[in-house]
């Protein structure tokens, strides 16, 4: 990236006006390449930090007897974050290489144009081709810029999707936690002393009711009344035959 200023200084007496026009795109591309390098460095640092956090979480989990739902959720979120960062790093690397190739093409075209202008003023056809090549390079840079804009939008969509995924996982964790709490509360209620007393009283009432049923059945049968012909008495007998435990 330092060869261009030296070449421009050497050619400045011959054609200073053409240099001003041809120096613009490489400077813009150079600035974009530097920005891509800074971004890639930041992403690499974030990936290293995230991997370190994952190792710490794994060591903490291995030290415990079993994993809690919160720890499992944190591991999944960290793994998804690492995967997204790695994908983003690869995209930045590809974009950086494309920008570097475009910058090299611009430099080569500018250098060839200046050399051809010095060597021969009669090669107009070749000069036209070189100018056409420069125009094509500008169109390529424009298309690449549009492609990078689309990549930025795609990255935003992926971030939103990750946020929605994390929100849904957090909601599921809340639901599971609430279910576990309800189960614990139910178990504690079943094991409480008050529930035991209520159950004992209920069993006592069932036994008393069963004894009363048997007494009434024996009275009706002992009276030798034809209860099948009396609807009211028949209904009473049928009720007495029901098992109280099944009610």
Swiss-Prot record:
Cross-link (Glycyl lysine isopeptide (Lys-Gly) (interchain with G-Cter in SUMO2)): 67
Modified residues (Phosphothreonine): 68
Record-linked Pfam families: CENP-H
Modified residues (N-acetylmethionine): 1
Subcellular location: Nucleus; Chromosome, Centromere, Kinetochore
Annotated TM spans: none
Record's signal peptide: none
GO molecular function, one term: kinetochore binding
Keyword Nucleus: yes
Keyword terms: Acetylation, Centromere, Chromosome, Coiled coil, Isopeptide bond, Kinetochore, Nucleus, Phosphoprotein, Ubl conjugation
Entry's Gene Ontology cellular component terms: chromosome; cytosol; inner kinetochore; kinetochore; nucleolus; nucleoplasm; nucleus
Ranges of Acidic residues composition bias in the record: 1-14
UniProt feature, compositional bias: Low complexity: 24-34
One GO biological process term: mitotic spindle organization
Major site of localization recorded for this protein: nucleus
Function field: Component of the CENPA-NAC (nucleosome-associated) complex, a complex that plays a central role in assembly of kinetochore proteins, mitotic progression and chromosome segregation. The CENPA-NAC complex recruits the CENPA-CAD (nucleosome distal) complex and may be involved in incorporation of newly synthesized CENPA into centromeres. Required for chromosome congression and efficiently align the chromosomes on a metaphase plate.
Protein family per UniProt: Belongs to the CENP-H/MCM16 family.
Protein name per the record: Centromere protein H
Species for this entry: Homo sapiens (Human)
Taxonomic lineage from the root: Eukaryota, Metazoa, Chordata, Craniata, Vertebrata
Name of the encoding gene: CENPH
């Amino acid at each position: 990236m330092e060869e261009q200023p030296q070449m421009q200084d050497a050619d400045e007496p011959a054609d200073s006006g053409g240099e001003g026009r041809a120096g613009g795109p490489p400077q813009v591309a150079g600035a974009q390449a530097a920005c891509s390098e800074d971004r890639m460095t930041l992403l690499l640092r974030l990936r290293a930090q995230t991997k370190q956090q994952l190792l710490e979480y794994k060591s903490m989990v291995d030290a415990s007897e079993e994993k809690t739902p919160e720890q499992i959720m944190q591991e999944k979120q960290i793994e998804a974050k690492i995967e997204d960062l790695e994908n983003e790093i690869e995209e930045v690397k590809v974009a950086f290489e494309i920008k570097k190739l475009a910058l090299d093409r611009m430099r080569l075209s500018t250098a060839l144009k200046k050399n051809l202008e010095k060597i021969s003023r009669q090669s107009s056809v070749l000069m036209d081709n070189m100018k056409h090549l420069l125009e094509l390079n500008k169109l390529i840079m424009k298309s690449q810029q549009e492609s990078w804009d689309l990549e930025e939008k795609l990255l935003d969509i992926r971030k939103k999707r990750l946020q929605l995924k994390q929100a849904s996982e957090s909601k599921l964790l809340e639901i599971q936690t609430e279910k576990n709490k309800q189960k614990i509360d139910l178990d504690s209620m079943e094991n409480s002393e008050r529930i035991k007393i209520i159950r004992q009283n209920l069993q006592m009432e069932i036994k008393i009711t069963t004894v009363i049923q048997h007494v009434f059945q024996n009275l009706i049968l002992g009276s030798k009344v034809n209860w099948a012909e009396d609807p009211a008495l028949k209904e009473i007998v049928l009720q007495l035959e029901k098992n109280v435990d099944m009610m």
